[in-house]
From Swiss-Prot:
It comes from Saccharomyces cerevisiae (strain ATCC 204508 / S288c). GO terms for biological process: plasmid recombination. SUPFAM superfamilies: DNA breaking-rejoining enzymes, lambda integrase-like, N-terminal domain. The lineage of its organism: Eukaryota, Fungi, Dikarya, Ascomycota, Saccharomycotina. This is Site-specific recombinase Flp. The plasmid 2-micron circle is a extrachromosomal element that resides in the nucleus and propagates itself stably in host cell populations. It provides no obvious advantage to the host but imposes no significant disadvantage either at its steady-state copy number of 40-60 molecules/cell. Gene3D superfamilies: FLP Recombinase, lambda integrase-like, N-terminal domain (domain 1), Intergrase catalytic core.
Length: 423
């Protein structure tokens, strides 16, 4: 088979002539060897002569080679190709070789293309039956169940995962980014993209009944195209989101917003985002490399989604599935495995007691369905009950110089004061 380098150096007219000559006196061997030429010609036709990269050529050539079939007697040839222009390709090849019939099957990276009626029927069945819905997510469910059956609490698992990043890199910044990302997805039951696309200029302080003051920010670019809020708040013990937010802001810089060329990008004037787009790849590798649990080493095991899986499980164990629905915006009818993998989000009022429960400054009484305060002097409500009490400090601009003028001064000052008191 002609190699990629030879094809690139072959003049187009010569390449076409060689291709046509194969069909003048066809044999099975000749036709079987035309996959590379087909790949190159099809790319030229569908991309108006644009050069093809080697990796792309190899990918497309594999698809054609594995699907190529022909009938010399009836002069017909069939193959799969990644395109939405199958009719154009067929017409172009027919023009080159009028005596032959070409059939091109659009390739979408799946075994077969389902009929739209089958797709709708399948989704309807999942909507009406939780058992059918569970089937699609059985692999992830089994792995998560294995993790939770280790006899450890959600918080012990969370702390072990946080600790595992200490051995990921010798660079403080890298470890800080991974720990911040994991904890942010955990406490917000969110996706990686939810945290990545947060608008730093949207940070603000909001009042909370149980914790006094918490930090709220906005993300408008989500996988479901529906905006949602992300929160950071004080928590008991080592798993304190504000401590990790402090470390993140001290060891990172604002990231210029990636230009989104689709959707409503023209109306989105966001200048910065919180994390780089490619962080998720190295984050997943870090989880796998220093995995505190064996399931992280599984190829398709939960990695960047582990935070939201853990929070969903925690709320479910507490018998608070209604909170899961609110935080993840899942409908009551589909609060099942499908809900846990759909994760649609919108700006929904999350009840104050969710933050109280996750902070661990409070315990939930399932009988009275009330939050019971645990005596702990580190609870910020013991000192700061209202936002007005925070005014007067100006330490944030010194502690977080990279974020001055981007994150609200009020938020930076509050976080700096909180850390000084906490330490």
């Amino acid at each position: 088979m002609p190699q990629f380098g030879i094809l690139c150096k072959t003049p187009p007219k010569v390449l076409v002539r060689q291709f046509v000559e194969r069909f003048e006196r066809p044999s099975g061997e000749k036709i079987a060897l035309c996959a590379a030429e087909l790949t190159y010609l099809c790319w030229m036709i569908t991309h108006n002569g644009t050069a093809i990269k080697r990796a792309t050529f190899m990918s497309y050539n594999t698809i054609i080679s594995n699907s190529l079939s022909f009938d010399i007697v009836n002069k017909s040839l069939q193959f799969k190709y990644k395109t939405q222009k199958a009719t154009i390709l067929e017409a172009s090849l027919k023009k080159l070789i009028p005596a032959w019939e070409f059939t091109i099957i659009p390739y979408y990276g799946q075994k077969h293309q389902s009929d739209i009626t089958d797709i709708v029927s399948s989704l309807q069945l999942q909507f009406e039956s939780s058992e059918e819905a569970d089937k699609g997510n059985s692999h992830s469910k089994k792995m998560l169940k294995a993790l939770l059956s280790e006899g450890e609490s959600i918080w012990e698992i969370t702390e072990k995962i946080l600790n595992s990043f200490e051995y990921t890199s010798r660079f403080t910044k890298t470890k800080t980014l991974y720990q911040f990302l994991f904890l942010a997805t955990f406490i917000n039951c969110g996706r990686f993209s939810d945290i990545k696309n947060v608008d730093p200029k949207s940070f603000k302080l909001v009042q909370n009944k149980y914790l006094g003051v918490i930090i709220q920010c906005l993300v408008t670019e989500t996988k479901t195209s529906v905006s949602r809020h992300i929160y950071f708040f004080s928590a008991r013990g080592r798993i304190d989101p504000l401590v990790y937010l402090d470390e993140f802001l001290r060891n990172s810089e604002p990231v210029l917003k990636r230009v989104n060329r689709t959707g409503n990008s023209s109306s989105n004037k966001q200048e910065y985002q919180l994390l780089k787009d490619n962080l998720v790849r190295s984050y997943n590798k870090a989880l796998k490399k220093n995995a505190p649990y064996s399931i992280f080493a599984i190829k398709n095991g939960p990695k960047s989604h582990i935070g939201r899986h853990l929070m969903t499980s925690f709320l479910s164990m507490k018998g608070l599935t209604e909170l899961t629905n609110v935080v993840g915006n899942w409908s009551d009818k589909r609060a099942s495995a499908v809900a846990r993998t759909t994760y649609t989000h919108q700006i929904t009022a999350i009840p104050d007691h969710y933050f109280a429960l996750v902070s661990r400054y409070y315990a939930y009484d399932p009988i009275s369905k009330e939050m019971i305060a645990l005596k702990d002097e580190t609870n910020p409500i013991e000192e700061w009950q209202h936002i007005e009490q925070l005014k007067g400090s100006a330490e944030g601009s010194i502690r977080y110089p990279a974020w001055n003028g981007i994150i609200s001064q009020e938020v930076l000052d509050y976080l700096s004061s909180y850390i000084n008191r906490r330490i």
